[in-house]
Regions:
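Divalent metal-dependent phosphate-bond-processing catalytic cores, especially two-metal-ion Mg2+/Mn2+ enzymes
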Residues: 1-3, 19-29, 33-45, 56, ...
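Active-site flanking loop/helix segments enriched in acidic
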Residues: 6-30, 69-83
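Conserved acidic
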Residues: 23, 47, 84, 88
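An active-site-proximal "capping" alpha-helix that borders the catalytic cofactor pocket
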Residues: 30-34, 38, 86-102
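Acidic/histidine metal-binding catalytic segments
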Residues: 42-52, 101-117, 130
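His-Asp-centered metal-binding catalytic motifs of divalent-metal-dependent phosphohydrolases/nucleases
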Residues: 47-76, 92, 112-122, 138
Length: 209
């Protein structure tokens, strides 16, 4: 059973108002769950860094107009909005620092968390294993059922298009083998879920009655 602990509830309560745009609130919670699962498999990581970072990583999008926000991450983007991705990282780091200090997180941890958030999308390498898990959790979310539904809504895609787009971004760019295995399993389930054969199973037919 995964639940937010006392520290993470305190962080979440302060972060939530900054995440109430473009489904970032639900995205961050699902990514938190993914991070918790990865932490059980990667003993060298520090949950005191990873979990606050994943809850706070997208708070900076609150400082960007939502329409421009989507243009910055669209699959057909032309690069003219790339500066907004950087802005959300910088502003997210600023917001995260303020929240972490209010919660009373140790200064040494604050510095590590903020460093991860500042560059979590644009930095192509991982600073360390904690950064790798944050990056991977963020990306693996894309191939969850929630992630695919959100991407469909954002960009007007059908289920197959969303799955192909999300799958392309949620494997090769991952840093940990554990996240790659998780992503591959989620993609496999999504593929089976869309098959004609599954649609004709008793349980599916029974559910429609």
């Amino acid at each position: 059973m995964i639940e937010l602990g006392e520290r993470d509830v305190a962080i979440w309560n302060l972060a939530a108002p900054f995440l109430a745009t473009r489904d970032n609130d639900a995205h961050s919670l699902y990514a938190y769950g993914i991070a918790r699962a990865l932490l059980t498999q990667i003993a060298s990581a520090d949950e005191n860094i990873v979990l606050p970072a994943i809850l706070l990583h997208d708070t900076g999008w609150s400082t960007v107009d939502e329409r421009e926000n989507l243009e910055a991450i669209a699959p057909d983007r032309d690069g003219s909005r790339d500066h907004l991705v950087v802005k959300h990282e910088k502003e997210g780091a600023r917001i995260a620092r303020s929240i972490l200090e209010r919660v009373g997180i140790a200064d040494v941890d604050v510095e590590q968390i903020v460093a991860i958030i500042d560059g979590h999308d644009t930095r192509r390498t991982a600073l360390n294993v904690n950064d790798a898990i944050v990056k991977d959790s963020d990306k693996v979310w894309r191939v969850t059922a929630h992630g695919r539904r959100v991407v469909m809504d954002w960009f007007g895609l059908d289920g197959g298009q969303a799955l192909r787009l999300c799958a392309a971004r949620a494997y090769d760019d991952l840093f940990t083998d554990e996240a790659k295995a998780m992503s591959a399993a989620l993609v496999a389930l999504a593929c089976i879920d869309s098959t004609e054969q599954l649609g004709n199973t008793y349980s599916r037919q029974d559910a429609r009655q």
